[in-house]
Amino acid sequence: MSWMTDYVRPKLRGLLQRDVPDNLWTNCESCGQMMLTKELERSEKVCPHCGHHMRATAKERLGWTFDGGEYTTIELPKMPVDPLGFKDSKRYTDRLKDARHKSHLDEALVVAHGMIKGQKAVVAVMAPEFLLGTMGAALGEAFVAACRLAVLQKAPLVVYTASGGARMQEGVVSLMQMPRTTIGVQMLQEAGLPYVVVFTNPTTGGVSASFAMLGDVHIAEPNALIAFAGPRVIQDTVREKLPEGFQRSEYLREHGMVDIVAKRSELPELLGRILGIMMRQKTVSDAAA
């Protein structure tokens, strides 16, 4: 036996067999650079190489938004499951079970209340990890519950949007959530409460055509896709080449659809300033009345 076979080979074999977590490294979706997942999480899932804002979970956004990461979530109303008895390659009820198991959420919207830079606020965050953040009856009812909570607490409502649109498994029931959520926004308007929307990537379909576009202030993360139909569908329909950056945050800001494009790290401070100004204006208006 030699030194090579007695020591080196077993050592190499042990190194190769050592368990390495599957999620130790993450590749940037934009530039392709590899980075440690823990480092990415410390940077709020923004690529340190190119600044690309990667997809975040609802709970991560709540932690980044509220002061000290402290907030209280509310229990959302229970809605009938699978009203149409829908089945394609898989039963809708089974898809919901899988989504709840993987995301540890009951629906694609999480509602919480707490403080943002000292300002009381209600925050509703859409969860792309739950069926791509699609909107069904339960999400519509959850949004209305967020509006009611804001009115009850006399607090502003901040909504982070991230959605693939209406949930096809619920058919017309899903489409009816567009006017349903609009009624929720009207409740805020009647109470004179600020309603701020933060667009994240992607915000599309029925969500973009309803409550997402009704904010008093529209903020967007950089390069977020904000659209009803995607650019490929539009290009195939009109048979013309679309402008560079079409339907992205910066393009929409230039054309008046978005007020501010802000980096993720800037959002808490920005929201705190905006909500503070708007709530002071409400106080002055109430006193004058």
UniProtKB/Swiss-Prot annotation:
Quote the cofactor binding remark.
Binds 1 zinc ion per subunit.
What's a Gene Ontology MF term here?
zinc ion binding
Keywords assigned by UniProt, alphabetized: ATP-binding, Cytoplasm, Fatty acid biosynthesis, Fatty acid metabolism, Lipid biosynthesis, Lipid metabolism, Metal-binding, Nucleotide-binding, Transferase, Zinc, Zinc-finger
| Superkingdom of the source species | Bacteria
Q: Any one Gene Ontology biological process term?
A: fatty acid biosynthetic process
> InterPro entries this protein is in?
AcCoA_carboxyl_beta, Acetyl_CoA_COase_Trfase_b_su, ClpP/crotonase-like_dom_sf, COA_CT_N, Znf-ACC
Instruction: Write down the SUPFAM superfamilies for this protein, in alphabetical order.
Output: ClpP/crotonase (SSF52096)
Class in the EC hierarchy, top level: transferase
Please state the pathway this protein functions in, per its UniProt record.
Answer: Lipid metabolism; malonyl-CoA biosynthesis; malonyl-CoA from acetyl-CoA: step 1/1
- Record's catalysed reaction(s): N(6)-carboxybiotinyl-L-lysyl-[protein] + acetyl-CoA = N(6)-biotinyl-L-lysyl-[protein] + malonyl-CoA
Q: What does this protein do?
A: Component of the acetyl coenzyme A carboxylase (ACC) complex. Biotin carboxylase (BC) catalyzes the carboxylation of biotin on its carrier protein (BCCP) and then the CO(2) group is transferred by the transcarboxylase to acetyl-CoA to form malonyl-CoA.
HAMAP family annotated for this entry? AcetylCoA_CT_beta (MF_01395)
Summary of subunit composition and partner proteins: Acetyl-CoA carboxylase is a heterohexamer composed of biotin carboxyl carrier protein (AccB), biotin carboxylase (AccC) and two subunits each of ACCase subunit alpha (AccA) and ACCase subunit beta (AccD).
Protein name listed in UniProt: Acetyl-coenzyme A carboxylase carboxyl transferase subunit beta
